[in-house]
A protein has these predicted regions:
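Short helix/loop segment immediately N-terminal to the Walker
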Residues: 219-234
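Structural motif
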Residues: 141, 232-238
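Conserved P-loop NTPase motor module
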Residues: 1-43, 289-297, 327-354
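Interdomain "pre-motor" coupling segment immediately N-terminal to P-loop NTPase/helicase cores
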Residues: 47-107
Length: 354
């Protein structure tokens, strides 16, 4: 579809559904301009309608459905005003609606180990049109209800990360991550029937303390040589909420303190946290730790209740969320991606010999 055809199509959709005080493009009240990155809604002022967040969201709802599946509008938290290069004061501003071409598409991987071994650099493919640059990642949070596909997605990430990072796995459930660690010669900290819960969490604290020592050593090296290169080091904790429940206050506070310090100081020294939990409220991890993580994933049932901790300001209206296992939302906060939350389809993969 040519740009002019797309502009006319969007104008027709807005004329029929927007209903703003009887104003339309037929009365020359607004126009639409399409560019590669999205489209502009250009109001001609003065006008009898108010240009605010409510109008922006209404246009978003209309056009996101009209453009699907050719384009996916990127959800904004508020009205996105941009100036236009013109001397005409009546049309010097516009509302901008950025988009991405197509819709979220799931990766299908026939041999995940072979796939991971052939990846270049530190890029982690998530979907066909979405990758994570691990060099720019501070930490990853994966939340979701039981049976939503958290462990399946975690196993994929572990397989990819094993080629670009040193790993330590903490597995309170002694389940899938422990078996993966055993099969891939990765250190696993897991409960033992002869140890108490507090003793197990103390062992986790000891590992986090070692991470903090490593951070300090690398900081000293960076102080003397700002171009020093380090291997990535990742601490993976499954069901993190299980660690903070049922332990003494002193051990719990030490666990929280170490998590915060590692998350705050780890990025420049390439030390990362990968945390998995059914939810990330303040009982799971401290708020300051949660706010440091820049890859946020919510899988499974998506509603305002399940997204309130990872995406507290997100308005779900208009977002086309895929259905099925391993689906949800993802937000990557770095210099390479828009900060907005986008739909997610986690990879489907197969293991050779299974």
């Amino acid at each position: 579809m040519m740009r002019s055809e797309l502009e006319n199509y969007l104008l027709q959709a807005l004329n029929m559904a927007l209903q703003i005080s009887g104003e339309s493009s037929y009365t020359n009240s607004f126009g639409v301009k399409v560019v590669d990155e999205g489209f502009f809604f250009i109001p001609r002022l003065p006008a009898s309608y108010i240009i605010d967040d409510a109008l922006y969201q209404k246009i978003y709802l209309i056009c996101n459905a009209a453009l699907y599946p050719t384009y996916s509008l990127i959800k904004q938290t508020g009205a996105y005003f941009v100036p236009l290069d013109t001397d005409d004061i009546h049309v010097k501003r516009a509302l901008f609606f950025p988009w991405s071409k197509g819709i979220a598409k799931r990766l299908i991987i026939q041999d995940v180990e072979n796939f991971a071994s052939k990846l270049d650099g530190t890029e982690i493919p998530i979907m066909e049109n979405l990758t994570i640059n691990y060099d720019k990642t501070t930490g990853i949070l994966i939340a979701g209800n039981s049976g939503a596909g958290k462990s399946y997605f975690l196993t994929y990430l572990l397989t990819v990360l094993s080629h670009i990072s040193d790993l330590v796995i903490v597995d309170p459930k002694f389940d899938v991550p422990s078996r993966w660690g055993r099969d891939n010669d990765v250190e696993v900290i897991a409960p033992n029937e002869s140890r108490s819960k507090s003793d197990f969490v103390s062992a986790v604290n000891n590992e986090l303390s070692k991470c903090l020592e490593l951070i300090h050593k690398r900081q000293q090296i960076l102080y003397n040589d700002c171009n020093a290169h380090f291997n990535h080091y990742t601490v993976v904790i499954d069901e993190v909420l299980a660690l903070s429940e049922g332990v003494t206050k002193s051990i719990k506070e030490a666990f929280y303190s170490l998590l915060v310090q590692v998350s705050l100081l780890g990025r420049s020294t390439k030390l990362h946290l990968l945390l998995v939990s059914q939810r990330f409220d303040s009982n799971a991890i401290p708020i300051s730790c949660r706010e440091q993580m820049n890859v946020l994933v919510q899988v499974g049932n998506i509603n305002t209740k399940t997204t309130q901790f990872l995406f507290p300001d997100l308005d779900l209206k208009g977002i086309v969320i895929p259905q099925g296992k391993g689906t949800g939302l993802i937000q990557i906060i770095d210099s390479e991606h828009p900060f907005q939350v986008v739909p997610l389809l986690t990879p489907t993969y197969y293991i050779k010999g299974e």
